[in-house]
Amino acid sequence: MWGGRFSEATDSFVAAFTASVGFDQRFARHDIQGSIAHATMLRECGILEADDVATIIDGLHQVLREIEAGEFNWSIALEDVHMNVESRLTDIVGAVGKKLHTGRSRNDQVATDIRLWLREETDNIIALLVRLQSGLLDLAEQHTDTIMPGFTHLQTAQPVSFGHHVMAWFEMLYRDTERLVDARRRINQMPLGSAALAGTTFPIDRTITAELLGFEGICQNSLDAVSDRDFAIEFTSAASILMMHMSRMSEEIILWMSAQFNFVQIPDRFCTGSSIMPQKKNPDVPELVRGKAARVFGQLMTLLSLMKSQPLAYNKDNQEDKEPLFDCVDTLTGSLLAFADMLPNITPNKENMRAATMKGYATATDLADYLVRRGVAFRDAHEVVGNAVALGIAEGVDLSDLSLAQLQQFSDAIGEDVFEYLTLEGSLAARDHLGGTAPNQVKQAVSRGRTRLELFA
């Protein structure tokens, strides 16, 4: 590959240390796809003869068949996926195979491979996200009036519906989907034709290659095209935010499954037991997703640290970009697959959720709002309700269980109709506006969600 310049062979340890074929063979299909497009462009531009290109393309198809059949012999001595493919191509078609690399460097070749691979993986991840969100919409629709506590500081705050809470998850994931769709636009720019760093002296037409490979744009500067990996960092950043959201969801499910909450049940197939405690049903799937978020965060830091001090253009450091990206994609894909199957099958324990809501004076804000509508300043209403809650705590009862006389001792603005506003159902129904937890609003949110998901179909 470069023997003409050197006076001695590469040290065997160095050859193994610098080889990437152990992991970048994952790009084989995309590498061959890019080579076929490159060869076709060379023919269209009159740089290679049509017969030679036909021979090269036939040979590349044979190489791909061997790889897919598991019959390909990968060689560390050939360093990477590119040289392994090219060497086998030359074995098959002879010296004409050596013409394939005309007007191309491994620098723009690998940058193209990464983008082709990541574009495909991004599409797969978006499809999984849409599937997961569709399942959440189904779950939310079933529970628009299933009452549960809404929390702040993990303390009971106000009543919400389980469906409303699930729709909060949906909104998080929807923004994640938008981020990935937006990142895909920058992934889908073609670096091929940039050669090593300065372009090529051959009269190539990059628009031909871009069209053949489905790129929507062409990298405008050859130095930038071969040396930056910001598109991979952006993807990993979006993946990190997504995993953060899934980790938060996991934490809630883990808490809700505990005996202390007992809000939800997860089907047994998503749980494991204990080797010593026969009673245990452990939420391993959400626990692992919560843990795997740390891996994705770490890969983002790896890529940022990898790029932070590199001068233009390509450096061998960039060989280290692949394994973090592979791990990020694999971890995210596995987590989404698990969630897409598990989350829509969660069963809420309605009675326990309702009972928990009754314990926390969740309608206190409703009583304050009631007083405000009767002319009491909010800060005064806040104090009145605080006193009423203190009495409820002392008596061991909910606000709705206090008598009218007990409530009126704190404010003469309280009338007999107050109890209509202290029911959990009344509290939900009162929040009847866009984004509110009223059952009707949650139903509308689900309907809008289905329409919005169609944008990603």
Curated annotation (Swiss-Prot):
EC number: 4.3.2.1
Major subcellular site: cytoplasm
Superkingdom of the organism of origin: Bacteria
Protein's pathway: Amino-acid biosynthesis; L-arginine biosynthesis; L-arginine from L-ornithine and carbamoyl phosphate: step 3/3
GO biological process, one term: arginine biosynthetic process via ornithine
Pfam family for this entry, one: Lyase_1
Compartments where found: Cytoplasm
Family as reported in the entry's similarity comment: Belongs to the lyase 1 family. Argininosuccinate lyase subfamily.
Protein name: Argininosuccinate lyase
